[in-house]
Amino acid sequence: MDESGTVSPNPRKSAVSRQWGWLRGYNGGVFSEDLIAAIIVTILLVPQSLAYALLAGLPPQVGIYVSIFPLLAYAAFGSSRYLNVGPTAVISLMTAACIASLPEGTRLISAAALAVMTGAILLIAGILKAGFVMNFVSRPVVSAYITGAALLIIVSQIKHIFGITASGNTVFALLGDVRANLPNTNKVALWVGLSAIAIFWLIKKYLAYGLVKLHVKSRRAKLIGRMAPILIVVIFIGISSYFSFADKFDVRVVGRIPAGLPPFDFPMLSMPDLKGLLVPAIVISIVAFVDSTSTAQELAARSRGRIDSNKELLGLGASNIVAGITGGYPINGSMSRSAVSFSAGGQTQVVGLLVAVFMALTAVFLTPVLKALPFAVLAALIIVACFSLIDFKSLGRTWIYSRADGITALATFLAVLLLGVQWGVLAGVVLAMALHINATLQPHMPLVGRFPGTEHYRDAGRFNVETNEIVKTLRIDESLYYANARYLEDKVALVVAESPEMTDLILMCTAVNRIDASALSSLEEINKRLKSADIRLHFSDMQSRVKERLFRSNFLDRLSGQIFLSQHEAMEELGPEPDWNQLSDHVEMH
């Protein structure tokens, strides 16, 4: 209670309420739904954790390790009710690309150090409230990157389907190695792998649909379809064990998995080794954040909620650090498992807590059951999962809508396939930013005119509008800054050269959100040049905050013309009566 007698809110309770708002109103009914969702997610996660560890080039138990304590860390610091963190295909492939060239004995500790570094980068970004960095990675880049990575993942798993060895970080390197080793194909592994691909694909494609046709409720049918692969995995384990695939047919299997929870141990590497992991850690942190936040935002939108991107950075950062110190590798939010949890009725991060408990029980009691699981089955699981990540339709739509975005997406896609996953995302981000900057260097600045009998002004090069030779209006479709200020000077000079009768030039600033110091200097120079040519310079439709900044300078004191509230007001005061015969020679467009 404060001095006025009012009860002050408990700051500790307020902090808890802000971070774990989903605890308000939590009851047995919500818990039962979270429990069901957690069981279903665990059934999906057990084989996935083994498969993604295989994809990362690490022992299978590592996939289980990163599915326990990191989930607790995300629940403590993340903002999404529904996001399920853990091993994923894309991040596993990026980890594999990073550690593949390292000596066999250092890969595990290097992967753990990579997770800690990734977590530290995300954590620092969260503390600095740098969630806005997601805006620098365009959706076409993300879509193209995921499509390219999915294809690369599929190619990387061919070796397990054929039961051969192959290495490489690019499509051509992998395919070349696979081709060279095809004579060593293990026919039993090939049979197992192709059978598993066919079965998993048929289940994914048709099981839920068939159950609905048999009058099973749609939601229940979908859940059964998502849980069915674990039954297939169990069947293959039984077949492998009964026929002794490993001993009699030399089929690679998971083998003995150490039982028990992961030990807590901070990975120690030399400074040169840590420097070598820095760039991959930065790239992985970007991809992990963008991918996870996109999934979290989509699920939040479905439930009319919202997420805090800065808290997502903290949650992902904490979970990756925990993954590293428990012998794991980098993780992020899983789109598939999060969607399953949401569809199964999961409502809070209690789902993640329960999944962590179930995975811990798996690590302690169920690992002996998994030792006969063929690698070919895990590879089939990965391949079928990656089919859904390939989205050529989105790339096609992007190309049709925007050629610049299409070029960026295509370059990202090809870079992933030809250069590898790490350089692919960097190439996409850099190219997207370069094209954006290039677009602002020479912004669209058309001369505009008025639709007859209206107060609407449009591009004279595209519309049939009124124009006159006395008052010209140049519409600036971009903020003005140092990189495009000279272009504005050149554009004004061109208009002056082509308009010998002009006495007034209006700069229509509807789209101008900012004018920096360099652009202000250019405007002062333009004003001086026009004044010497007996032409007045005016502004219209200028935003208040831009106008306020101009008032701080003495530019307006020297301005030869005026600042008008609207373009129509400017033309009413400056323009002559319209000459209806003087229309721009263009077809009218609406």
Task: Indicate residue ranges for each PLM-predicted region.
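Intrinsically disordered or compositionally simple regulatory linkers and C-terminal tails
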Residues: 2-13, 574-590
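The feature marks cytosolic C-terminal regulatory regions of anion transporters and related permeases
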Residues: 388-553, 557-558, 568, 578, ...
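C-terminal structured domain segments across diverse proteins
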Residues: 327, 354, 566, 570, ...
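Transmembrane helical cores of multi-pass ion-transport proteins
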Residues: 2-455, 468, 522, 554
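Alpha-helical elements of the RecA-like P-loop NTPase motor core of helicases
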Residues: 232, 547-548, 572
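Short linear loop/turn motifs
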Residues: 314-315, 560-571
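Generic hydrophobic alpha-helical segments
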Residues: 95, 178, 488-492, 570, ...
